Amino acid sequence: MANKENIPLYIKERFSALYQSDQTLKSLFTIIHDQEERIFCEYLESFILKEVTYTVFKSYVKKTAQYLLNNKITPNHEYVGLLMDNSLNWVALFWAILMIGGKPVLLNKKLPINITEDIIKLLDIKYVISDVHLDNKNYFIFDNQNKLLPEIESLDEVKKEDWENALVLTTTATSLNYKICIYQGKDIYHAVMNAKGILKKNKMIKEHYNHRLKVLAFLPFYHIFGLMAAYFWFSIFGRTFVFLKDYSSDTILKTIQRYKVTHIFGVPLLWNTIAKELKRKINQLPDKDKKKAYKGIAFSYQLQNLFPNYGRRIARKILKPIQSQLFGDSVFFCISGGGAIPKETLYLINAIGYPLYNGYGSTEAGITSVELRSKPKYRILGTVGKPLDSVTYQIDNDELLIKGQSLCSEIIYKDGQKHIINKDEWYHSGDVFKKDKKGYYYAIGRNDDVYVGENGEKIHPDEIEKYVLMTSVIRYCFTTYKQELALIIQLSKSNYAVKAETINKEVKDCLSLLKDKGYQINKVYYTFDDIANINAIKVSRKILDRLLNEGKVKLEDFNTFSSLVETKKEQLNDEIVHRIKMVFSDILNKDINEIGEEDDFFMTLGGTSLDYMTLLIKLEQEFETKITFDKKSFSTVKEFYDYIITKEK
């Protein structure tokens, strides 16, 4: 769709305002919210779409500042914790804390609460604004609804502002050793200015749908990726944010389609989930349709490599049935960051017409690079691009070193030690990188996460995971266990038996593929225990190692899986047949013992066509699946059983 505004001119005006600013957080607030009637966010209230302009939101922030003062939150340039999920009120509180002289500590809700409490104690935080009810006198409980709250709207704007110029982020603690990173206004300013170089290198990032650019607020704003790439890079241009009611896959997909979201930023877990769901749906199709779908995806990928923009438009047409079950046709730009992403995931998402780019950054250094080339053949390589304008890279002994003005100003370690960052010196990232002949960088793994093979070769598990996308298991992880390179898979207790054939095939194919790539996996283990926190965006090998040592995760040799499945299948067969019979019994008002496995629903049991429609609905609800017929319909318990078992696989 053509854009109503002159986007290049408006972008120039935005950067001009930044150039003329004093590079403080206060000036960023003014520049962001001085955008007349541009829409900051949209939300539904009583089934009515509400729009909040940046002008209205600016006033709301000032009223929120007064609300905090009224509730005796007077920071005096000390730390103030913010422990909430994304919402328009999270953003309002973030700015309001700064406005009344507080240093907002953006606490990570995905961390265990004991780590959060440690951070609060370490920084001596006297006020924590939270949407979590905890027995702690420091906590001020806030009703975190995603709407303008009447109790705040009714207040006057704060009269006296006392701006602070620092914000605080915490690392994700996947290594068990969290860090606290302090960013000054100038650091954030330089990070925001990186948007200029990105816009020059990639035109798709500016694309609108129906004259609007809307960003899904999926990534938490307390995460550097969410705060910088999603919030700051787009709010500076007055773009619209769409917040989620919850993080269920159904809510995410419906929200994207309902609000016509154009830009999505997520961690590999999101994209892997989408890729898994896509493969699952395609593989459930009849063979003819399945081959047609994969052929269409391959054609779309090839066409986009020849003509990126034209190919993407064609992809939206020929793959419309696939897109309609995912994000719809409004999504133009996606970025993955925060960990390794499989090549197959990058291929599938890009091929179906959703441009997915891979980026790199850290809490300490900010977002420092992203792959921005227009052809998907480059994006699926797994490169994280070239360094952004505010930083430079150097590789020393395989480790990435970073230097630049957008790094944080200070790091506070778990033991209380402080380290001031010298922007003219190299920062050791701890990440293993390589660089190709064209100057593009690749993240390989962590320095402290390496397996040394029998021949002395160093193997990084993250590098292995880039080749693998397993759809039949809950989570999987390549790691060193008992001094061997192992694959650990987490299975679902409820359906591992019916998925056994797929699980076995995926494990076999995975090992074969990796062997061809030169990786020998010595052992495969399975478990039904959680190998990561339910909220974790990826499996932390250090945390998994601790769980194994503490006996909280029990592993079984995968060689014993088949015998376990056979035992379970006997129980499962009886259970599924019983559940189907119960549905028959309920609809036909017959005793369950009167219903045989091969009794015809109509001829033997006396069901009507209306009863049959009810039967289909009830069975779909019972087994959480869609029943579709290929050549003939089903009318016996056995036929429905065979179909459900096949679908489960």
Regions found by a protein language model. Give the residues of each.
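Conserved structural elements of the adenylate-forming
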Residues: Y60-Q66, C181-E207
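Conserved AMP-binding A3 loop
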Residues: E51-T55, A166-M193
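Conserved AMP-binding/adenylate-forming core of the ANL superfamily
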Residues: F40-T74, E78-S87, F94-W95, N114-E117, ...
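Conserved ATP-binding/catalytic segment of the ANL
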Residues: P387, V391-Q394, E399-E454, K458
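Gly/Ser/Thr-rich phosphate-binding loop
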Residues: T262-F265, E277-Y378, R475
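Conserved pre-ATP/AMP-binding loop-to-beta segment of ANL
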Residues: E37-I39, E151-T170, L176-N177, K203-K214
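Conserved AMP-binding/adenylation subdomain of ANL enzymes
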Residues: V192-K214, F221-R316, K320
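Conserved C-terminal "lid"/linker of ANL adenylate-forming enzymes
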Residues: K508-K568, L616
